[in-house]
């Protein structure tokens, strides 16, 4: 069975279902509420497990009640959380998420700066990559030092090293991005990184700077990547979107799993696109992430 090591953030999402997203600074009322686990790498790990892979989550949480909620949920989905570190005196990440009736979302996140940024403790954890096949690494950018350590180790071992590149308040650090074998941007992040809204030009800029495979996700428009000098496109799967929260994380997780299984890029992109679309087609947080059989039936 293929495996993906996912490193990055896990947060507790407080999700409010609303008719429309707020436009004014007054009191607003939600139609529904739920608290669910979120975070790029953590949700990607759940997607890997749901799609039939072995999933490991590596991250940092505060030593607080929210951490136990998050770890229990991940464990319930079959994710190995034994390599996650709890930090005394720090708070686990939390987000307020507003979702409108079209599935579009607004997110306010808090990440405690007291979470330990030193990745030295990872060296023993990352030995699981050595001498392995059918395994890939996936990291988000919310813990850059950890992402650099994981991706560099995977790349050195000749394994797929996938970086989830989303909008980042701290900007981008090329020394981290260059550790990836596969740099997968969100559409806004690619524009921010390359300084142009011409996405074909932006991909060429990114590839020249990073010297690796580059692509980006664009929601319902699908996903795009460079194949030599050619721009390739995986169209979005037509669905009625009701909840887009975590769709990009599902895409990244299942894309990394596809690479770990040895799929060629077009097939891995199709696999990930179907998984992300199915997730958007239903409400329910991580329970809405599709199983392997559901993905294959749609494929």
Language-model segments: which ranges?
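Ribokinase/PfkB-type carbohydrate-kinase core domain
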Residues: 1-10, 73-86, 98-232
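Glycine-rich phosphate/adenosyl-contacting loop at the front of the ribokinase-like
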Residues: 1-60, 65-69, 76
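Hydrophobic packing within well-folded, soluble alpha/beta domains
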Residues: 48, 57, 74, 96, ...
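Gly/Ala-rich phosphate-binding loop of Rossmann-like dinucleotide-binding domains
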Residues: 49, 155, 260
